[in-house]
Amino acid sequence: MDVLSCSIKTLKGLYDLSGVEVGQHFYWQIGDFLVHGQVLITSWVVIAILLGSATVAVRNPQTIPTVGQNLFEYVLEFIRDVSKTQIGEEYGPWVPFIGTLFLFIFVSNWSGALLPWKILQLPHGELAAPTNDINTTVALALLTSAAYFYAGISKKGLGYFSKYIKPTPILLPINILEDFTKPLSLSFRLFGNILADELVVVVLVSLVPSVVPIPVMFLGLFTSGIQALIFSTLAAAYIGESMEGHL
């Protein structure tokens, strides 16, 4: 019993030391609805960063581009290449959507590692990257689903739904299930990676000297960028598939 009691106390001490909170939310009461205040706060901060950066970089275009202008032109070219590769020749109208997804997710992911969210104290929970909340990633995934349904229907009309019985009607349940698994995989992949990255960094910072977690933080930044690329690339691929003659 003494060994068990000692083990329990040790585990409790480690938990208290880490100070990690998962599932704690700060809500705003708006009418009859509860709104995740922390997600709205961090999302608007990310949006403000994106709008501010874009305004500063392109408000006075130069014949010889500045560093900021060069950076934004490179990002735009990169997003266009991703869209064209995945969607095909009709990629043009979808560049803003794919670009918005990529930039919002990229900056959101990096904000979790670079911005000192914990300085702002909330009555419940704590501020973190918007993509650290499952509601944000599900919303992004549902937007992607709506986009590829719209792309398919606008290209093929109601004939788009004939894909569910191709190549044989026996596959109808599987083809329907696929449309549910796409947003689920998108949302949970992004949410799980960002949440795990932030938890690892928080625990390491709490348990070991501050210089030790730095390599993990750099790895987290790299992973965050990759996750933004994966999400936007898959979104473009799904849109491209919905516009093809076969799926």
From Swiss-Prot:
GO molecular-function term, one example from the UniProt record: proton transmembrane transporter activity
UniProt keyword list: ATP synthesis, CF(0), Hydrogen ion transport, Ion transport, Membrane, Plastid, Transmembrane, Transmembrane helix, Transport
Database matches in NCBIfam families: ATP_synt_6_or_A
Protein name: ATP synthase subunit a, plastid
Annotated Pfam families: ATP-synt_A
Organism for this UniProt entry: Cuscuta reflexa
Cited function: Key component of the proton channel; it plays a direct role in the translocation of protons across the membrane.
Protein's UniProt keywords contain Ion transport: yes
A Gene Ontology BP annotation from the UniProt entry: proton motive force-driven ATP synthesis
Topological category with respect to the lipid bilayer: Multi-pass membrane protein
Family: Belongs to the ATPase A chain family.
Keyword Plastid: yes
Assembly and binders: F-type ATPases have 2 components, CF(1) - the catalytic core - and CF(0) - the membrane proton channel. CF(1) has five subunits: alpha(3), beta(3), gamma(1), delta(1), epsilon(1). CF(0) has four main subunits: a, b, b' and c.
Ranges annotated as spanning the membrane: 33-53, 95-115, 134-154, 199-219, 220-240
Domain of life: Eukaryota
UniProt lineage: Eukaryota, Viridiplantae, Streptophyta, Embryophyta, Tracheophyta
Cellular component annotations (GO), alphabetically ordered: plastid membrane; proton-transporting ATP synthase complex
Localization of this protein: Plastid membrane
